[in-house]
């Protein structure tokens, strides 16, 4: 199934529901043909897109107006996949994950019902926050069909430093307790802390000088961020931790990309763990509410 419109997607899921046919979003039903920029309100720093648009295409369209979606996960996923799988990259340090950038969504439920919530402006507070709810849902609650997103201006300048250290937790602590405002801050285990500054040329130069005076380091090119995303992309596990546990977590890792602000480490091994009873109950209730027939699997 490859719907080319919202109504066609709704009709396909309605038919599948009537037949009792299970559907896997992304496999049985592709959003590849739902790939348009529907609106770009540059003055409001927002856009509305179909969920099948790939980040590379959206970046190119937004760049024409000097703006960007501050989301940089590995590869070139669709916007819908970024929400459904909670995909983000180094820029999440300053700009957050998809749930922080989504303003509104249009969904198609398993029975073909179309549901919209949120809005196109940053101050909208009406309705249920379905946008945040479907982040990380893996396509099991609804098809994400359209998304309204918060944007940011393209930075005029950027610069990266890399600090080689035996105490990455100390470097991170010093940076995060300072007045510096990096756009990205990753620990590449073992022994490197990468820091990205963006903004006007003068502001970037000033922050770069302050950072080097505080923690040392040398300037580096964007290759370090490509490495961080590549290592994240091939990681087999995602380890969550409390910010205060950074030092303890780093001491247990031989190789990883660690995002201290998000409290997550991408590691080259599978990470066990089962949701607790309360979390499983919430998941079950959400599934019963949004897809009681169990069409979306």
What is the predicted role of each segment?
Residues 2-3, 23-31, 49-51, 68-74, ...:
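General beta-strand structural signal in soluble alpha/beta enzymes
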């Amino acid at each position: 199934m490859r719907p080319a419109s919202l109504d066609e997607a709704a009709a396909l899921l309605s038919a599948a529901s009537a037949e009792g046919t299970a559907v896997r979003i992304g496999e049985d039903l592709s959003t590849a043909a739902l790939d348009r920029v529907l609106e770009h309100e540059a003055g409001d720093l927002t856009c509305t897109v179909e969920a099948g648009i790939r980040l590379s295409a959206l970046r190119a369209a937004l760049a024409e107006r000097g703006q960007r979606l501050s989301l940089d996960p590995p590869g070139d996923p669709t916007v819908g996949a970024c929400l459904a799988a909670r995909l983000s990259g180094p820029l999440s340090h300053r700009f957050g994950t998809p749930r922080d950038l989504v303003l509104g969504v249009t969904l198609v439920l398993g029975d073909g019902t179309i549901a919209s919530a949120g809005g196109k402006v940053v101050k909208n507070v009406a309705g249920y926050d379905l946008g945040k709810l479907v982040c990380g849902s893996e396509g099991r609650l609804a098809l994400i069909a359209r998304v309204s997103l918060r944007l940011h201006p393209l930075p005029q300048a950027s610069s990266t430093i890399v600090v080689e250290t035996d105490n990455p937790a100390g470097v991170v602590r010093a940076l995060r307790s300072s007045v510096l405002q990096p756009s990205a801050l990753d620990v590449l285990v073992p022994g490197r802390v990468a820091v990205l500054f963006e903004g006007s040329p003068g502001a970037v130069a000033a922050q770069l000088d302050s950072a080097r005076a505080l923690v040392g380091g040398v300037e580096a090119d964007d290759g370090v961020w490509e490495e961080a995303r590549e290592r994240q992309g091939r990681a087999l596990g995602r380890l969550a931790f409390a910010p205060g546990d950074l030092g303890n977590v780093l001491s247990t890792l031989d190789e990883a990309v660690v995002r201290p602000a998000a409290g997550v480490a991408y590691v080259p091994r599978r990470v066990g763990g089962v949701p607790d009873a309360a979390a499983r109950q919430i998941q079950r209730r959400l599934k019963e509410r949004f897809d009681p027939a169990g069409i979306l699997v």
